[in-house]
Regions:
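C-terminal segment of N-terminal export signals and the immediately downstream linker at the start
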Residues: 1, 18-28
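N-terminal secretory signal peptides and thylakoid transit peptides that target proteins
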Residues: 1-13
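Non-transmembrane alpha-helical segments in soluble domains
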Residues: 8, 46, 108, 186, ...
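Extracellular ligand-binding/catalytic regions of CAZymes and related secreted enzymes
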Residues: 24-25, 40-41, 51-52, 218-303
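Helical hinge/lid and interdomain linker segments adjacent to catalytic or ligand-binding clefts
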Residues: 28-29, 34-126
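Catalytic beta-strand/loop cores that center a nucleophilic Ser/Cys/Thr
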Residues: 50, 56, 74-75, 86, ...
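A glycine-rich, often tryptophan-bearing local segment used as a flexible ligand/cofactor-contacting loop or short
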Residues: 92, 97-187
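Short, well-ordered beta-to-alpha junction loops that form the rim of enzyme active sites
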Residues: 122-123, 214-215, 250-252
């Protein structure tokens, strides 16, 4: 028998879900980086966005064309990119992809239509054309001269330069950029730290504005001292592209996602990119909804 108590009990989760700000918004994660275990961190992050914030998330992962299995060593096959055609937001974590034109078209059409993007770490060098140089999309390659600096520099704000912090020896402490302490993306964000090393950034393009600066630490612990020989450089910034909001961070090591402050910044960035900054909670909920024990970083060859 359905009682008032059981009816109210069944309504509580439904009402809570209805109140989640992201309800009705579709986020597509485009993933494939070979080194930083994005195939593990992005699914966990997507589940968190769905459970705590109501966004509907779709994952597009690199798949072995023979087996159909997720394979981070694959850099030429992202099945399911047509989901971008009706997406509200693209979250990308890519590195050195050279996709078939039919797949690449969905990514470029999305960006060139002026639609919001959130990008992580190696996405500054998302594409690397070495085989199909006649492709109309080869101009988006990270060392492109025709479209100077390719997708990374033109769309996101910078391409790959080099490591600034020593890789796997110097970690990163996040410091709000001057004047950005009250920016919505940093709402409730404290104590950002991660084992990712700071990338070298020369000049951010267009209307880019740093949000978070990276302090190079002389060690791999949150308590490691700063390296006094290395200045602070941007590790997260905002800009526009074709009228759309773009957020980019060069953080994204799987260990970075163990940090509440970093996860909260990423959640807030999704809200901001969608023009929903008024909906960003004072302290966004960022608890993982699945166990998060990422594998060590390192390159994985195609299976």
């Amino acid at each position: 028998m359905i009682t008032r108590r059981t009816l109210m009990g069944s309504l509580v989760p439904a009402l809570a879900a209805a109140r989640l700000a992201g309800k009705g918004r579709h986020v597509v994660f485009v993933v494939g980086d070979q080194e930083y275990r994005s195939e593990e961190s992005m699914p966990a992050f997507a589940k968190m966005l769905e459970a705590h914030h109501g966004f509907r998330c779709t994952l597009v992962l690199p798949r072995n064309p023979q087996t159909g299995e997720v394979d981070p060593g694959v850099s030429d096959n992202l099945v399911g990119l047509e989901a971008l055609d009706k997406a509200d937001l693209m979250v990308m974590f890519l590195r050195f992809q050279e996709l078939p034109d039919a797949q690449m078209k969905h990514i470029i059409d999305y960006a060139e239509a002026g639609r919001p993007i959130v990008a992580l770490r190696t996405s500054t060098h998302a594409f690397n054309y070495q085989k199909n140089l006649a492709s109309p999309y080869a101009r988006y390659s990270f060392r492109s001269r025709e479209f100077e600096g390719g997708f990374g520099r033109q769309v996101l704000g910078e391409t790959w330069i080099n490591h600034y912090g020593v890789h796997q020896q110097e970690s990163t402490r996040g410091v709000p950029a001057p004047g950005m302490e009250r920016h919505p993306i940093l709402r409730g964000v404290k104590d950002v730290w991660g084992p990712s090393d700071v990338y070298a950034i020369t000049t951010l393009t267009g209307d880019s504005k740093p949000i978070l600066l990276g302090q190079v630490l002389a060690g791999m612990e949150p308590t490691s001292p700063p390296n006094p020989a290395k200045k602070l450089v941007p590790v997260a910034w905002i800009k526009s592209y074709k009228g759309a909001r773009v957020f980019t961070t060069t953080m994204g090591h799987p260990g970075d996602f163990a940090n509440d402050g970093f996860r909260r910044m990423m959640v807030n960035a999704c809200y901001w990119a969608l023009g929903m900054e008024s909906k960003i909670p004072r302290r966004a909920k960022v608890d993982f909804t699945v166990p998060y024990n990422p594998s060590p970083i390192g390159f994985r060859k195609r299976k």
